[in-house]
Amino acid sequence: MTESSPLAPSTAPATRKLWLAAIKPPMYTVAVVPITVGSAVAYGLTGQWHGDVFTIFLLSAIAIIAWINLSNDVFDSDTGIDVRKAHSVVNLTGNRNLVFLISNFFLLAGVLGLMSMSWRAQDWTVLELIGVAIFLGYTYQGPPFRLGYLGLGELICLITFGPLAIAAAYYSQSQSFSWNLLTPSVFVGISTAIILFCSHFHQVEDDLAAGKKSPIVRLGTKLGSQVLTLSVVSLYLITAIGVLCHQAPWQTLLIIASLPWAVQLIRHVGQYHDQPEQVSNCKFIAVNLHFFSGMLMAAGYGWAGLG
């Protein structure tokens, strides 16, 4: 019996693919979008823009998302829900404790970045807001809470990446708050929650086995696909209502250019909702919708700020 080298041509590409899936590069848009949108809203409404603050905040947010992704892999390995997940970082390394240590390093790096930003401003409001967001992020999978297993992950996403992150990014630029944050906060919160919602369609069997009552486990895939459709449509309705009520500048209607991804997501999940293999990539379509709609909204506020 011959032992194949881990670097053999036949296995190396597969291993690289698994590592890419484990690291989840596309998922870091959930850090980029709220910080960019919140900062753009500050510029659009107040004319304030501090590039150094934006850069530190963005890098800190990316580090915190790395903590969330890695620690969630650790917590999922503890419950056994990821036992068949080849692209789990814990399964790839075989070292749960090392992954947990690295995840906490990223958390520390993110918090230190925010602390440096707050120290320079002599204002700890942003750190306090993100502290609440970090706590909520922990409750998603972390013991003893594990609220994601109760189907509350989407609500946590909506609050954390919507009102909390947008308000923190806005405040970091303007040192103030505004009721006009409502439209972009709800918009980004829902678009982020849609990504998590889509991640459940292909893993109903594993969720059931682990006792995880995800929204798709509770609703079923067909009703879940209909809820997804309403959620996607709501992104455009919320923006239109915000414009009509003078809560958002008309330039935010640029998000209409993201409709191709919205239509693709609705059609894809509508057709394959009960076919795990075919529907499994819907979360990446959701990531595209989240990223491009968010960047378009940020561009709209930037445009408004130019007068």
From Swiss-Prot:
Keywords assigned: Cell inner membrane, Cell membrane, Membrane, Transferase, Transmembrane, Transmembrane helix
Pathway stated in the Swiss-Prot or TrEMBL entry: Cofactor biosynthesis; phylloquinone biosynthesis
Cell membrane as UniProt keyword: yes
Membrane-spanning ranges: 27-47, 51-71, 98-118, 125-145, 147-167, 177-197, 223-243, 284-304
Cellular-component GO terms for this entry: plasma membrane
Main location per the UniProt record: membrane
GO BP of this protein: menaquinone biosynthetic process; phylloquinone biosynthetic process; vitamin K biosynthetic process
Effect of inactivating the gene: Mutants grow photoautotrophically under low light conditions, with doubling times twice that of the wild type, but they are unable to grow under high light conditions. Mutants contain less photosystem I (PSI) than the wild-type cells, and membranes do not contain detectable levels of phylloquinone.
Catalytic activity as recorded in UniProt: 2-carboxy-1,4-naphthoquinone + phytyl diphosphate + H(+) = demethylphylloquinone + CO2 + diphosphate
Molecular function terms, GO-annotated: prenyltransferase activity
EC number: 2.5.1.130
Entry's localization field: Cell inner membrane
Top EC group: transferase
Role description: Involved in the synthesis of phylloquinone (vitamin K1). Catalyzes the transfer of a prenyl chain to 2-carboxy-1,4-naphthoquinone.
Record-stated family: Belongs to the MenA family. Type 2 subfamily.
Name of the featured protein: 2-carboxy-1,4-naphthoquinone phytyltransferase
Organism annotation: Synechocystis sp. (strain ATCC 27184 / PCC 6803 / Kazusa)
Gene field: menA
